[in-house]
């Protein structure tokens, strides 16, 4: 029997995650039946569950994948950029990502077992945000009168608010200036320090 290359396995896993993202976004966790997952991924249940133990593991892997992508953006450009990407028309699968994010939030609220499993995986976004903020503070770009943990919590709260706003279908056309304000709120303002009395 021929061996399957790691590249092939990785591509198949990506195909499953991409299809599952669409399926979970459209139907929610409960509505994403095995049959619907097969249709969305264009693969058999055997192929899907060769890579993932069960539907719960698939959903967790998908949510973790989204969180890792966000953490990568945060590390390079900050959490506000993640929010800007959500608003950008050209962002990859924004509605599907949003659906997954909302389903994670719902399950965190209603499913204690999921909450426990997710807690182990969800720290990466918070960690990436705090590291980015610390680097910005060391570079002199971040306000120093508020603790980094508080600033990270503020930014995460704004992200959750933006996700809710988009989920409700509210207009997002004019939110760029709002994100500018959020960004300015965490930056260090040197103008006051540089003004010398006459």
What are these language model-derived features?
Residues 1-27, 31-43, 56-57:
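Basic, helix-initiating cap at the start of DNA-binding domains
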Residues 46:
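Key DNA-contact positions within bacterial/archaeal DNA-binding proteins
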Residues 52, 60-66:
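Alpha-helical DNA-contacting segments of helix-turn-helix folds
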Residues 61, 71-99, 148-155:
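Hydrophobic alpha-helical connector segments
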Residues 92-117, 164:
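Amphipathic alpha-helical segments used for helix-helix packing
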Residues 115-119, 123, 137-185, 189-198:
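Hydrophobic/aromatic-rich alpha-helical bundle segments in the mid-to-C-terminal region
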């Amino acid at each position: 029997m021929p061996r399957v290359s790691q590249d092939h396995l990785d591509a198949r896993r990506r195909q499953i995650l991409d299809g599952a993202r669409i399926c979970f976004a459209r139907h929610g966790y409960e509505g994403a039946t095995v049959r619907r997952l097969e249709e969305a991924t264009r693969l058999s249940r055997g192929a899907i569950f060769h890579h993932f133990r069960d539907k719960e593991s698939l959903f967790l892997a998908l949510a973790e994948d989204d969180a890792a992508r966000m953490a990568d953006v945060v590390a390079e450009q900050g959490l506000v950029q993640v929010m800007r990407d959500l608003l950008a028309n050209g962002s990859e699968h924004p509605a599907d990502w949003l659906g997954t994010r909302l389903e994670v939030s719902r399950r965190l609220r209603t499913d204690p077992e999921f909450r426990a499993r997710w807690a182990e995986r969800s720290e990466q976004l918070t960690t990436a945000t705090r590291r980015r903020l610390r680097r910005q503070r060391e570079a002199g770009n971040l306000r120093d009168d508020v603790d980094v943990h508080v600033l990270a919590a503020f930014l995460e709260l704004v992200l959750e608010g933006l996700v809710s706003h988009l989920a409700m279908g509210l207009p997002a056309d004019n939110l760029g200036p709002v994100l500018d304000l959020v960004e300015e709120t965490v930056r260090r303002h040197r103008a006051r320090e540089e003004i010398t009395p006459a």
